[in-house]
Amino acid sequence: MIQRLLTHIAWPVRVLWIAFALAPNGFGVVAWILWAVVAIGTWIHHPISLTTIRCLAPIVVFYSVVYALSESLSSLNIAVVTCGIISLMLMFTADYGSAHVQAGAYGNERRFLLRIPAPVVLPTLITWALFATVLVVLENAVQSENYVLGIPLLLALIAMSWKFAPQMHRLSKRWLVRVPAGWVVHDDLLLAENLLVRSHNLVAIDFALAESDALDLSGMTRGVPIQISLREMTDVRLSQLGARLLKTMDVLHVQAFLVATTRTPLN
């Protein structure tokens, strides 16, 4: 049953997210706008939608939980909050992320979303927390009609979105891609340019061993990485961040490298 749910995961997310808004929830103008943007994103599968959903949905659910705790905990309030929390949990599953990134694929591409590098997790959470705080305070300012505070917050929110939204979206554009010509690592966070492995140069693709000496492009994230072994040496051009994390030069010649996907490409 669980596997069947994940196979058609888009519909449970949509239904639960709509049910989440059907009962009294204390939403103001800002919260309703955020809810609507997320709702639209659940119907339009795309990497941009994935970024939008995963950034905004937690804020809406948090606001609903706070409202429910401040009111009498009726069975209806508990049911509504539960719908929101379950929907949010499904939005952060590997299957849901894969559905969005695959929807933007070209032709015969098969995209496998990469896990977020461990050193980037904390800065990402801090950035999101600042963004979420501004949104929550803006919601309270609008509800209390405190426009003296609300207008500067709105301007700050626009500036933060302009600055940080592209950085957050980069995490939804990191893929291992299977194409007719072979495999491509599309990761502008750790790589300066895409890494193409043609089929004739591929020796093996399998789970990495613990003592593997392959170049680690997984970003030291959790889980067992995938090792891609090559017949001939190939150039890997690292971004400034990638070179800094690996403590090496920005151009390397390698015969094997590691990546960490949210779903295995070995099936």
Please name every model-derived segment.
Residues 62-69, 90, 229-267:
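Terminal and domain-flanking low-complexity segments
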Residues 183-185, 194-212:
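Phosphoinositide-dependent membrane-docking surfaces
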Residues 213-238:
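Short, surface-exposed polybasic-and-hydrophobic patches located at secondary-structure transitions
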Residues 1-8, 42, 74-134:
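N-terminal membrane-targeting/pre-transmembrane regions
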Residues 29-37, 77-87, 149-158:
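Hydrophobic core segments of alpha-helical transmembrane domains in multi-pass membrane proteins
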Residues 103-177:
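Anionic N-terminal interaction surfaces
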Residues 173-188, 195:
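Polybasic phosphoinositide-binding surfaces of eukaryotic membrane-targeting domains
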Residues 1-73:
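Membrane-anchoring hydrophobic segments
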